Amino acid sequence: MLKGFTPWPDELAETYRKNGCWAGETFGDLLRDRAAKYGDRIAITCGNTHWSYRELDTRADRLAAGFQKLGIQQMDRVVVQLPNIKEFFEVIFALFRLGALPVFALPSHRSSEITYFCEFAEAAAYIIPDAYSGFDYRSLARQVQSKLPTLKNIIVAGEAEEFLPLEDLHAEPVKLPEVKSSDVAFLQLSGGSTGLSKLIPRTHDDYIYSLKRSVEVCWLDHSTVYLAALPMAHNYPLSSPGVLGVLYAGGRVVLSPSPSPDDAFPLIEREKVTITALVPPLAMVWMDAASSRRDDLSSLQVLQVGGAKFSAEAARRVKAVFGCTLQQVFGMAEGLVNYTRLDDPEEIIVNTQGKPMSPYDEMRVWDDHDRDVKPGETGHLLTRGPYTIRGYYKAEEHNAASFTEDGFYRTGDIVRLTRDGYIVVEGRAKDQINRGGEKVAAEEVENHLLAHPAVHDAAMVSMPDQFLGERSCVFIIPRDEAPKAAELKAFLRERGLAAYKIPDRVEFVESFPQTGVGKVSKKALREAISEKLLAGFKK
């Protein structure tokens, strides 16, 4: 068992097995089975390249042998930072087959985050593309390696320069160690409201069950053609039902280099895409673009929208613009996933964020004193179930705060439940900014800013934004003369912070409002910036 992993209690695990939730299958088994069943059927389309299920299975075998030859062993962690390219699949399935654990980093992460992931996970390797969207990841790898000289294996998909070329690692398949379905399969990143992301351990058992239920709820089968427009390292496009759900169902995954309509719309037309997933800001962009373009999007049957709350007004436009069914998705990398059902009435689809996908999902809604609220009232969402984790990786202190004694996960979401068990998301309890689906931890950015010599104190809050839902505003108490906002943003970039974490607005103040117990009142700061924005709008 992976050290630092919190397993389900034996009694509950046995219940999930008896109920058929956990079928004893690994991801290696899953791909082998689909290769036998679907053979030459296309699994992955990337540009003009097509990989069949059989070819993907063979490549995973050969790459797993190469990883083992390199010295990567069962339970080793490997930071994988790959965009939407075909190599993503051979890499993760090779690691699954070997029993090594991918740690999924986002393409937008930079040296601060990647160095932390590699160090905290004690990574045996770091896998990157050569360059993507104008950014050279080999340069990033050099920065990371300069801070972590012990990181020896840097593997590159493409032109490797001084690093290891991914393609050269392919070797003759060998006998590999047995992987158990109860083993941790990979580590995902939490949204992170208390600084850098925590790592989320997902097992073969729990994650494959989540795929099975997603496939059933979303009506996927071998005729499904899914466009991966969002970065696949996110849990939502990975498994809700995402690319892995489509492979589970025997369908075809089409990779888009970006979610831009310029890239995505021609692919929908050419590949006859039937389903895709977006975050609300991108759904708005797509709807606006569709009115001025002539792409044939008639193959699209389902548009999923999740990652942040989608307004009812915008939700109502989807069917009129695209002629397809909207499916709202609300979930978390820690587990619980909710969907509106494809045959739900329109009022449920546009006004709720769905209901749990499994009959074994348990939910509680509590007030601030850990008491159940009355039906229909707003409160804190807690959950547990066969695919919701029991603890973060190597995070005892966080686990004590994030989980109840009986294993319910405190999601940090403020919700209310309808009579029919549908969830309406009202906001976040945690100090976290949801910038168009990308979660920004205020504390992480504040800590970086406090390293600037001209900054005495910093407090970052969300501010409303019509396009992204929320943007970030940081309030700064300067030491003497206030620095320029551009200087602070450049400072954060130099420290390797991802672009989406850079504050959208900087306000300089002499002091912060305080709560009754002497803490910074971020509620007052949010109100202050909202009022300022409103006043500016009225002018």
UniProtKB/Swiss-Prot annotation:
GO terms for biological process: siderophore biosynthetic process. It is an enzyme of class 6 (ligase). It is found in: Cytoplasm. Belongs to the ATP-dependent AMP-binding enzyme family. One of its GO terms (molecular function) is 2,3-dihydroxybenzoate--[aryl-carrier protein] ligase. Pathway: Siderophore biosynthesis; bacillibactin biosynthesis. It comes from the Bacteria. Involved in the biosynthesis of the catecholic siderophore bacillibactin. Catalyzes the activation of the carboxylate group of 2,3-dihydroxy-benzoate (DHB), via ATP-dependent PPi exchange reactions, to the acyladenylate. Its main location: cytoplasm. It catalyses: 2,3-dihydroxybenzoate + holo-[ACP] + ATP = 2,3-dihydroxybenzoyl-[ACP] + AMP + diphosphate. Its EC number is 6.2.1.71. ATP binds at G191, G307, V329, D413, R428, K519. Gene3D superfamilies: 3.30.300.30, 3.40.50.980, Luciferase, Domain 3. Keywords: ATP-binding, Cytoplasm, Ligase, Nucleotide-binding. This is 2,3-dihydroxybenzoate-AMP ligase. The gene is dhbE. Substrate binds at H234, N235, S240, K519. PANTHER family: LONG-CHAIN-FATTY-ACID--COA LIGASE, NONRIBOSOMAL PEPTIDE SYNTHASE PES1 (EUROFUNG)-RELATED. GO terms for cellular component: cytoplasm. InterPro entries: AMP-bd_C, AMP-bd_C_sf, AMP-binding_CS, AMP-dep_synth/lig_dom, ATP-dep_AMP-bd_enzyme, DHB_AMP_lig.
